[in-house]
Every structure is written in structure tokens, then in C-alpha cells.
Amino acid sequence: MKKFFAVFIFVVGALSAQAATNQYLYKVTLVQAAPGKLLELIDLYKARATAYQAAGDEAPMWMRHSQGDHWDLLILFPLGSYTEYYHPERVAKRKKADESLAASSEKFKGDIAWQEDLFAYGPALADLRQAFANGAYFHVEMFVALPGKFADLYQEREMENAYAKALGEPQNFIFVRDQGAAWDLFTIGVFRDLKHYAQSADVPVQEQEKAAKAAGFESPGQIGPYLRRFISTHHDTLAVAIR
């Protein structure tokens, strides 16, 4: 019984921490372009973003696949909350913007081979914008948790952030699914460039060991195996900024 309550308290605590740090709503769109249509699709999204900004929406943040998963674009649309985004006035303005873009709607359909959408709660918009403004290289990890293991997965992501912080590396932004695609949680690490992303390999082994143990891991080599205890699916992608 004591063990049960200890686990219960841990799970509640982890979920409460999640609720406190992931309060901003985003729509996340993953897109694979039809063959030969990627650049045209990027231009279409840029035109739509300009029209939506004029209608009062926040500018999206996005990236282009370099290697890893099969999507070409990951687009983060800042919503704030469902109440804000679906306010009748906002909806009417977006509808008017869509009408001005009617000529491009068929092009969108022809340029997209695959699309997946997810509504997720994530970090404060100002923090994410600052990171994207200073970074041009991204590491995206997307997860489906094993049944009953979501809180453990979330805690593991925070442990990896503690490890990164101790080594002076960027911490991952954590996003938690609300509805849509199957991903329970995904993280985005933002780096200046490929060299910045790879510089952790230059950290002395002793410092890595110390940071890993301080974060709650047995050793740096056990970070991956520890993560795998909690997940059924894990996709890794490296991506670059779209300006």
C-alpha cells in the first residue's frame, strides 16, 4: 500500500509540473511534399502565414527536414488557447483571409503527399521565439509512451534537460499532446548549427559522468536504455531553419 501511494504521489507530481510548464497551445503540422513540390509548398505556406498574420494570428515557426523521419516540414502555429484561437472574431478574420487565398487552395492539395496534425501544449511563446531567432539547427524527438508510462517519459525528458544544462548545452523544449496525431510528447532542441549540436562529443568523460549522475542516470551510456523503458515508438529528426 505504501508503495502504491508513493507511485501515485510521484505521478501526480510529475503531471502537476507538466501542467505548470506547458500551458501555451500550439498546432503542430507535419508535411511531406509531393515529389518536386517542396519549394512551391514552402512559398504557399509563406503566403498563407502572411495573410493569417494580417488577420491577427501569430507568425508560425518552422523547419525543414535534413535527415531522419519522412516529413519535409514541421510547422508550429502558436494558438495560445482554444478560446483565443476559436474566438468568433478571429475565426471570421481567418475565413476572410482564406477567401483571399482561394486560388492557392487547390495547389496546396496537389503539393502535399502526406500531412499529420497535432494540438500540443508547450513552452511560453516568447521563450520559443527567442530560441528560434538565435538557432538554425534542430533536433526533434517524437514519442509514443508505453501504457501507463507517460509520467515516467516526461520525467526522463526533464532529466535529460538537467543533464544538458549541467554540460552547458541547450535544453529541449517539451510539448505534450492534447489531441490529434498519436504522439504523446515531443521535444525540440535548438542549436546554432551542426557544429553546436555536435559539440557535446568534446565534453570530457568525467564531466559527462558527473552530469549524468546528478540528473538521476547511472551513466551517460545508460541514458538511451533508460528512455527505452517508457516508449513504444521514437522518431528522431535533424532539421534546419527556414527563413
Outline where the language-model segments fall.
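A periodicity- and composition-biased signal for non-globular, repetitive helical segments
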Residues: 8-9, 147
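Hydrophobic h-region of N-terminal signal peptides that target proteins for export
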Residues: 9-18
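Positively charged n-region of N-terminal signal peptides that target proteins for export
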Residues: 1-4
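Short S/T/G/P-rich N-terminal loop/turn motif that feeds into the first structured element of a domain
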Residues: 18-243
